[in-house]
Swiss-Prot record:
The protein's name in its UniProt record: Urease accessory protein UreF
Keyword list, A-Z: Chaperone, Cytoplasm, Nickel insertion
Disulfide bonds: none
Family: Belongs to the UreF family.
GO cellular component term, pick one: cytoplasm
Keyword Nucleus set for record: no
Subcellular location: Cytoplasm
GO function term, MF aspect, one: nickel cation binding
Subunit structure comment from the entry: UreD, UreF and UreG form a complex that acts as a GTP-hydrolysis-dependent molecular chaperone, activating the urease apoprotein by helping to assemble the nickel containing metallocenter of UreC. The UreE protein probably delivers the nickel.
Coarse class of the protein's main subcellular location: cytoplasm
InterPro entries: UreF, UreF_sf
Task of the protein: Required for maturation of urease via the functional incorporation of the urease nickel metallocenter.
């Protein structure tokens, strides 16, 4: 996938895919991710997260054994169903993605971002393959499903999408925690660096997994998202 005249150059197709992927999963892409903490706000108030070390432990678990892995599996399955034009399979994945969200606020978080992502991406990067995939999903669309079908429509390599998606996910979690703990910029980047060895294998597991492999072992994080709904003072919507 490189230019034959320069072994270090990107092919035109790969350069376009990389450009789109970096744009879609950039913090500046307007899906409203900054407004959500995925329950971290309650975890900070409860004392579960109080510094960079405890944040790293919490996010490592969320990535490998919780929302990160599950979202990765859903993204991959939606991507494959959309690529194959399997509308029934895509609808089943989309329905499951919304049904398995553990709390009302997390459901709002993923469906609001999913709707924003697919609307903006489809207007800025139109594709004849997108409208049928959107229609197949039915009503509400979870964020990883939206990323999966848009990436499939533009033939962005799935492995790269998964890695970039999980990096964006954990980056947003860290951004929220930095405002809540609070953490300085250097500590925030140390946490991101510490999670690098977690992102890659989680993406690889999600790539190889089926829907039967979905499951979470982060009950405390799920409980945090539930308890956030009645938290008295809040900065975030989840």
């Amino acid at each position: 996938m490189t230019d034959a005249t320069d072994p270090g150059a990107l092919s035109a197709a790969l350069a376009a895919a990389l450009y789109r992927l970096m744009t879609w999963l950039s913090p500046s892409f307007p899906v409203g991710a900054f407004a959500y903490s995925s329950g971290l706000e309650w975890a900070v108030e409860a004392g579960d997260i109080k510094d960079a070390a405890t944040l790293t432990d919490w996010l490592s678990a969320m990535l490998s054994d919780g929302a990160g892995f599950c979202d990765g599996v859903v993204l991959a399955q939606a991507y494959r169903a959309a690529s194959a034009g399997d509308d029934a399979r895509l609808r089943a994945v989309a329905d499951l993605a919304c049904a398995m969200v553990p709390s009302r606020e997390r459901h709002l978080e993923t469906t609001t971002q999913g709707r924003a992502f697919v609307e903006i991406a489809s207007h800025a990067w139109s594709s004849a393959r997108l409208p049928p995939a959107i229609a197949a999903c039915g009503g509400a669309m979870a964020y990883p499903v939206a990323v999966g079908i848009v990436s499939a429509a533009h033939e962005v390599p799935l492995a790269a999408v998964l890695h970039a998606f999980l990096h964006a996910l954990v980056s947003n979690w860290i951004s929220a925690a930095a405002r809540l703990v609070p953490l300085g910029q250097t500590d925030s980047q140390r946490v991101l660096a510490a999670l690098e060895p977690v992102v890659a294998p989680t993406a690889a597991r999600a790539l190889a997994a089926s829907l039967d492999d979905l499951g979470s072992a982060t009950f405390r994080a799920d409980l945090a998202s539930l308890r956030h709904e009645s938290q008295y003072t809040r900065l975030f919507r989840s």
